[in-house]
Amino acid sequence: MEIMNFSLNSPVFLLLSFFFLLMVLMQLTGSRKYKGKRLPPGPKKLPIIGNLHQMVGSLPHRVLKNLADQYGPVMHLQIGELSAIVISSADKAKEVLNTHGILVADRPQTTVAKIMLYNSLGATFAPYGDYLKQLRQIYALELLSPKTVRSFWTIMEDELSTMVTSVKAEAGQPIVLHDRMLTYLYATLCRATVGSVCNGRETLIMAAKETSALSAAIRIEDLFPSVKILPVVSGLRTRLTNLLKQLDTVLEDIIGEREKKMFSSNNIQPSTEEEDMLGVLLLYKNGKGKDTKFRITNNDIKAIIFELILAGTLSSSAIVEWCMSEMIKNPRVMKKAQDEVRQVLKDKKKVSGSDLAKLEYVKMVIKESVRLHPPAPLLFPREVREDFEMDGMIIPKKSWVIINYWAVGIDPKIWDDAERFEPERFSNSPIDFYGSHFELIPFGAGRRICPGILFGTTNVELLLASFLYHFDWKLPGGMKPEELDMNELFGAGCIRENPLCLIPSISVAGN
């Protein structure tokens, strides 16, 4: 059988030969770069690809945990060109993110982020410095402050009512929860970022879904960044560039329309109709923000809006889906959570933001779920800014630092019966997931902790409470709880391999 039909002097062969020789050269150069440095221990590296073969085709967080069991909580891997330091314990994560926090405050610059976030603008991928500090301050004090999140309760409750009505219409029929949640989350995020009147919402959602899909795998283009031709040959650059053109057209129109409306009559504040994140950002663009010295551009605004829509959807839906999965497998927990919600709400027509503080057991369910099923088992990587020493070992500049939070979440040294779903372990416990307790950091910690934790967890609590209040749930086809698979699919986050399909019945207590 003919496998390759090109001659030895064909362009394809010459290109592959050049690529191979280049890889060998980089391997030799990379080996010399670390010569004489005591790196953390790790498995043997193959020429050119390093440890890449150990990551392909498996769930990376599980592979890395197994390797850490052998090589320790601070481990060195070579993944293509990239030097990676993998941290697999709570105390070492605290040491890296707190003690050496300033030295690991950068993010690696991925191909997707560079193109879709306007050269890595926004709070997630921007290099550490004055721009990022000022931007995170705007997030904390204005865009995602507790006061602002409370102001979005009306939007959340409105979109929840729409979702609940759609589920009620299909009571008794199997539904895929993931789809319903994404519809709610995209609608809520679009309204919170750019307002209720938004031409091009479908394009925003399409671009977010496409970008998430393209971020859902280890990309060869990012593992061999010095080979500039890879994004071109793979077609990734063309695909992203075309997607960005569609996104950019919509966002420019939205920004232009709003800016004209806000400032054409010498207005200095958004009207009531315009109280969303875009209105706040436009004040900063026009020198009318709280910090009048900090100015931003249209590209900053577009990156921030798109980043918020991206970050606020898949992680929240994944958390709720895993919560529901665990409660279906543990009927005792489901009943206890439903009883709490229905007791707190009593005869109310719907769940509201003001009810959430009283739902103590529901919060325990969420904590336990993100412990076992974190939305990002491997926290967003950090990039080392300068060499530093840790336990007598050198953590080299430009290395990626990867926190395997999933390994921390099931560490038997921290958690009793670590792999069991037991929300009561958080009863009367001070542990929260806001970055101070390193045994529970699903949203990161330190200088790059997720700035949208409150907004995201509010959506999660509202979704989960609504499902528990309005409906009773069972598996389709007479399936028993213990038969539900809990297989994972690793991508931009960690979701169920098979989306959760349940049959809702309308609860008398919640209606």
Curated annotation (Swiss-Prot):
Localization per record: Endoplasmic reticulum membrane
E.C. no: 1.14.14.-
Name the record gives this protein: Sarpagan bridge enzyme 2
Residue stretches spanning the membrane: 6-26
Organism: Rauvolfia serpentina
Annotated keywords: Endoplasmic reticulum, Heme, Iron, Membrane, Metal-binding, Oxidoreductase, Signal-anchor, Transmembrane, Transmembrane helix
Group of enzyme by EC: oxidoreductase
Biotechnological relevance of this protein: The strictosidine aglycone-producing AJM7-DeltaHYS yeast strain expressing pathway genes of the VOM module, RsGS, SBE (GsSBE, RsSBE1 or RsSBE2), RsPNAE, RsVS and RsVH, accumulates vomilenine. Additionnal expression of pathway genes of the AJM module, RsVR, RsDHVR, AAE (RsAAE1 or RsAAE2) and RsNNMT, leads to the production of ajmaline. Ajmaline is an anti-arrhythmic alkaloid commercially used as an efficient drug for the treatment of arrhythmic heart disorder.
Protein family membership: Belongs to the cytochrome P450 family.
Annotated tissue distribution: Mainly expressed in roots and, to a lower level, in leaves.
Binding site residues for heme: C450
Pathway linked to the protein: Alkaloid biosynthesis; ajmaline biosynthesis
Gene name per UniProt: SBE2
Topology relative to the membrane: Single-pass type II membrane protein
Major location (coarse): endoplasmic reticulum
